[in-house]
């Protein structure tokens, strides 16, 4: 076995043969068998809990399977450690990068095999070798730079260079674009294509459908720890078929849409101007209506939400809520009026990562109960958190679990649970399902429709065309800081929405 590992696989397919993994009370993987070919990008798709991450941890040597083997080329493996996996030519690039921020780029790249002379690190040789590894991949990065001073996208390139320094034949990417800019994503896609064309086996895990169809050559779908199907040709696949395969039901069932009777005017916006809005914005939303906002990056949708939630002051225009004037000088004013925001970047603006799920749910409600006394307040908060966890179906081992360890979908449901603890009239959802798996998305959509049925006006900003068409009663389109069109649900299609969203030619 060790001899085979030391021979480092340099070619051939990656095969999973009957992989099973059992944790106490949970069968995480059940008889997983499939093949990923060299010279291809092979996607692993499935809802949270489908088994994708467990399989990658087995591939990387972090977990050991209860049964089954891996095969790379002609060699079979059952890795006992990450060191054995690395020696066999495997690199797993996790969402949370395994690098040391306090060390230089060169030290990170060559950690464990730094060149030395007379027992001391030969820094000149180390920087030269690091520069060679970065050449053509990230030429702008100085090997002497402290890793923590790089952007996340640049750090990811260092991780890839580290994998290439070990002559990795199998490279697995786990949600690699979750925190990257559009430019960094384009660069990463080009690098993945290059690695594929060099004959490597690339495994790719992502919730972002557009990336799967952009860069992948084959897809394997998992559900509840079981293999469902491998699509060997992307030409055999479309978005709807892939989603149906992942969740086991038709795409239209995912959105949970159902017609509702609207219950009169809620929020009216007239001639609104402010940071990010280039022309006066006017619209109204009804009680019980789901109003979608679609647009490309930089269209002004998030900036509009910041004004409506009191985060940014308007420079002109007026607001009315339930027919009464509404003045917003701060988020406190918006919350007091019942206008509540779930922000786009939930990790930075929506949650307190080191605090518990219960504490995050009770953040907004706590000021209303400080006069009840510590004992009563503590009891109310405990009961409220448990009630919202149950109502929102937040999957957590305990209300005291730090929220940072929950999936994106469960974090989002906890944020929604926070607002349900308070009087709500208008709910602003900015990219509510970004980075969330399909099953959790369906739960979020169900919550949206339930709130609308209860008379809440729900305004949703989304860059996902299928999503905004699937859940909205009516859709407004923004481009370059202005509203460029309005479509009812039965009028909307991808072509019309994109046409309205594209920047206009200015004379």
UniProtKB/Swiss-Prot annotation:
Q: What is the superkingdom listed in this entry's lineage?
A: Bacteria
One of the entry's Gene Ontology molecular-function terms is: ATP hydrolysis activity
Task: Establish whether keyword Lipid metabolism is in the entry.
Answer: no
Provide the topology term for how it sits in the membrane: Peripheral membrane protein
Q: Where in the cell is it found?
A: Cell inner membrane
- Give the keywords, sorted: ATP-binding, Cell inner membrane, Cell membrane, Membrane, Nucleotide-binding, Repeat, Sugar transport, Translocase, Transport
Q: What is this protein identified as?
A: Arabinose import ATP-binding protein AraG
Source species, please?
Pseudomonas syringae pv. tomato (strain ATCC BAA-871 / DC3000)
Which gene specifies this protein's sequence?
Answer: araG
């Amino acid at each position: 076995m060790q001899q085979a590992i030391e021979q480092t696989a340099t070619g051939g397919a990656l095969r999973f043969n009957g992989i099973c993994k059992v944790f106490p009370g949970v069968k995480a993987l059940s008889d997983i068998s499939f093949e990923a070919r060299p010279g291809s990008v092979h996607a692993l798709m499935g809802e949270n809990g489908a088994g994708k991450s467990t399989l990658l941890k087995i591939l990387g040597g972090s977990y050991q399977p209860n049964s089954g083997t891996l095969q790379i080329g002609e060699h079979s493996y059952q890795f006992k450690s990450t060191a054995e996996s690395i020696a066999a030519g495997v690199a797993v690039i996790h969402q949370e990068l395994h690098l040391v921020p306090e060390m230089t780029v060169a030290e990170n790249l060559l950690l464990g095999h730094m060149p030395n002379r007379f027992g001391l690190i030969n820094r000149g040789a180390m920087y030269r070798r690091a520069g060679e590894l970065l050449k053509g991949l990230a030429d702008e990065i100085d090997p002497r730079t402290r890793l923590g001073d790089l952007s996340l996208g640049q750090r990811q390139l260092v991780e890839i260079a580290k994998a290439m320094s070990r002559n990795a034949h199998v490279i697995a990417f786990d949600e690699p674009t979750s925190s990257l800019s559009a430019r960094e994503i384009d660069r990463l896609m080009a690098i993945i294509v290059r690695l594929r064309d060099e004959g490597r086996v690339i495994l790719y895990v992502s919730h972002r459908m557009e990336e799967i169809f952009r860069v992948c050559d084959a897809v394997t779908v998992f559900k509840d720890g079981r293999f469902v199907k491998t699509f060997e040709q992307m030409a055999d696949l479309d978005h709807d078929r892939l989603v149906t395969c992942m969740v086991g039901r038709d795409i239209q069932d995912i959105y949970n849409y159902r017609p509702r009777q609207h219950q009169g005017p809620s929020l009216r916006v007239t001639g609104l101007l402010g940071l990010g809005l280039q022309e006066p914005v006017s619209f109204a939303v009804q009680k019980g209506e789901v109003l979608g906002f679609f647009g490309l990056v930089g269209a002004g949708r998030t900036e509009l939400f910041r004004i409506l939630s009191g985060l940014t002051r308007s420079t002109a225009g007026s607001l009315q809520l339930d027919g009464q004037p509404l003045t917003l000088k701060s988020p406190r004013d918006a919350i007091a009026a019942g206008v509540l925001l779930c922000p786009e970047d939930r990790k930075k603006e929506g949650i307190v990562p080191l605090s518990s799920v219960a504490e995050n749910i009770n953040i907004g409600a706590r000021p209303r109960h400080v006069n009840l006394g510590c004992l009563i307040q503590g009891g109310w908060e405990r009961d409220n958190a448990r009630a919202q966890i149950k109502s929102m179906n937040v999957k957590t081992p305990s209300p005291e679990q730090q929220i940072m360890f929950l999936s994106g979908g469960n974090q989002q449901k906890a944020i929604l649970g926070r607002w349900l603890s308070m009087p709500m009239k208008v709910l602003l959802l900015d990219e509510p399902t970004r980075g969330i798996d399909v099953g959790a998305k369906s739960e979020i959509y169900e919550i949206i429709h339930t709130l609308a049925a209860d008379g809440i006006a729900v305004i949703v900003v989304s860059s996902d065309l299928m999503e905004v068409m699937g859940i909205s009663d009516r859709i407004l389109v923004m481009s370059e800081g202005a509203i460029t069109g309005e479509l009812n649900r039965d009028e909307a299609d991808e072509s019309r929405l994109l046409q309205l969203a594209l920047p206009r030619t200015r004379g």
